[in-house]
UniProtKB/Swiss-Prot annotation:
Enzymatic reactions: [ThiI sulfur-carrier protein]-S-sulfanyl-L-cysteine + a uridine in tRNA + 2 reduced [2Fe-2S]-[ferredoxin] + ATP + H(+) = [ThiI sulfur-carrier protein]-L-cysteine + a 4-thiouridine in tRNA + 2 oxidized [2Fe-2S]-[ferredoxin] + AMP + diphosphate; [ThiS sulfur-carrier protein]-C-terminal Gly-Gly-AMP + S-sulfanyl-L-cysteinyl-[cysteine desulfurase] + AH2 = [ThiS sulfur-carrier protein]-C-terminal-Gly-aminoethanethioate + L-cysteinyl-[cysteine desulfurase] + A + AMP + 2 H(+)
UniProt keyword tRNA-binding, yes or no: yes
Organism for this UniProt entry: Streptococcus pyogenes serotype M3 (strain ATCC BAA-595 / MGAS315)
This protein's name: Probable tRNA sulfurtransferase
Function: Catalyzes the ATP-dependent transfer of a sulfur to tRNA to produce 4-thiouridine in position 8 of tRNAs, which functions as a near-UV photosensor. Also catalyzes the transfer of sulfur to the sulfur carrier protein ThiS, forming ThiS-thiocarboxylate. This is a step in the synthesis of thiazole, in the thiamine biosynthesis pathway. The sulfur is donated as persulfide by IscS.
Pathway(s) this gene product operates in, as recorded in its UniProt entry: Cofactor biosynthesis; thiamine diphosphate biosynthesis
Length: 404
């Protein structure tokens, strides 16, 4: 027998009361986005489950994709069949025969939500257990901690049989907690911050600053590859490329070296906030970790934050670098993050950046700039690209291949 579908069990969604179906429908849409590379797949949801019909598609890559989607508590490959006692008996016998080995223990666990079905749960457990003994007389039944728990569900539309329960990613479906702008540089920390924001249901749009010719096409492709990795957790992501060359050259030419980083980050924050307002986001997310670098001391954060009243979420702020690296490796962004492409935060980095910049000094130096004009030109020059989970070679790999 081949699996018919993957049955998805919802996580925290069961606690959402009147909003439950809104959360479930969002999860369904996210699953459809993530599984877009598999055109034969169909997805439907009810209040208790989401059903991913395989329609002949190999189940293993579907399971691997679904395990990453936030809002999924658990999933099971299942056999779907008509609600017929003879069909159930044959299916249970075939499945257990395929799983049998010496010493194997099992139990049948039946759940009947269709109360019009001819047998109740207790009767089905007895009948199907007896059917297993008919073909496997040496198998042992065990009610506590058996090797195999064969779950049989009798629902209104069909019967379902499964024996695997695979842990999902948990969290909330992406998009159920509003929208935020993720400042993604291309380093290790910001993709991890994005992952953690996605886990709590935040719909992120990625803001990436590019300063050609100081930053290369490879740096841009790297940021897009990182964004593509994040689409595995909740579907498509809007990637916003911000032209930043003019501003960086202005800062380099007119500001004291010690304040280059502070002023650069203040402009980035202003621009991100303007994009957030334009695109109806609610928060800004970044990968700052307290004390990790000069721009991430409390004094620096205070001086940079002063340009906006928008909430700033810093998911990795209390994490050690090694903890962030471990998470980056777990979500498969680390190898991309360490590719040796420059970013806007490093190209004009001073040898001795100010670790305790004074807000008054930053504001005084900014009097040398046409702040509104610079921000407006940057925002008007953004390029928005929708990044999807399609199975393609990484952009950076394509670029390297082209060069070779």
């Amino acid at each position: 027998m081949d699996y018919s579908e993957i049955m998805v069990r919802h996580g925290e969604l069961s606690t959402k009361g009147k909003n439950r179906m809104r959360f479930i429908n969002k999860l369904k849409n996210n699953i459809q986005d993530v599984l877009a590379p598999f055109p034969a797949i169909t997805v439907r949801s009810d209040r208790d489950r989401t059903h991913v019909s395989l329609n002949g598609t190999d189940y293993q890559p579907i399971v691997e994709a679904l395990k990453l989607v936030f809002g999924v508590q658990a999933l099971s490959p299942v056999y779907k069949l008509e609600k017929s006692v003879p069909l159930l008996v044959t299916a249970v016998q075939d499945i257990m025969t395929s799983l049998y080995r010496d010493g194997l223990t099992f139990k049948i666990a039946t759940k009947r939500s269709d109360h019009a079905f001819e047998l109740d749960s207790r009767e089905l457990n007895s009948l199907l257990g007896g059917a297993v003994f008919e073909v496997l007389p040496n198998i042992q039944a065990q009610m506590k901690h058996p090797d195999v728990t064969l779950k049989v569900e009798i629902r209104d539309e069909a019967a379902y049989i499964s024996y695997e329960e695979i842990k999902g990613a948990g969290g909330l479906p992406v998009g159920t907690s509003g929208k935020g702008m993720l400042m993604l540089s291309g380093g290790i920390d910001s993709p991890v911050a994005g992952y953690l924001a996605l886990k709590r249901g935040l719909d992120i749009e990625v803001v990436h600053f590019a300063s050609p010719p100081y930053t290369s096409p490879g740096a841009l492709a790297k940021a897009q590859d990182l964004t593509r990795r994040l689409t595995r957790f909740g579907g498509n992501i809007q990637f916003i490329e911000v032209p930043f060359t003019e501003i960086q050259e202005e800062i380099k030419n007119k500001a004291p070296e010690a304040y280059l980083m502070t002023l650069t980050r203040r402009f980035m924050m202003r621009i991100t906030d303007a994009i957030r307002e334009q695109r109806k986001g609610l928060v800004i997310v970044n990968g700052e970790s307290l004390g990790q670098v000069a721009s991430q001391t409390l004094e620096s954060m205070q001086a940079i934050n002063a340009v906006t009243s928008t909430p700033i979420i810093r998911p990795v702020v209390t994490m050690d670098k090694l903890e962030i690296i471990e998470m980056a490796q777990a979500i498969d962004t680390f190898d991309i993050s360490i590719q040796p492409f420059e970013d806007c935060c490093t190209i004009f980095a001073p040898d001795r950046p100010k670790t305790n910049p004074k807000l008054g000094n930053a504001e005084k130096y900014e009097e040398r700039f046409d702040i509104d004009g610079l921000v407006q030109r940057a925002v008007s020059g953004i390029v928005v690209t929708e990044i999807t989970p399609e199975i393609v070679n990484d952009e950076v790999e394509n670029l390297i291949d082209a060069l070779l």
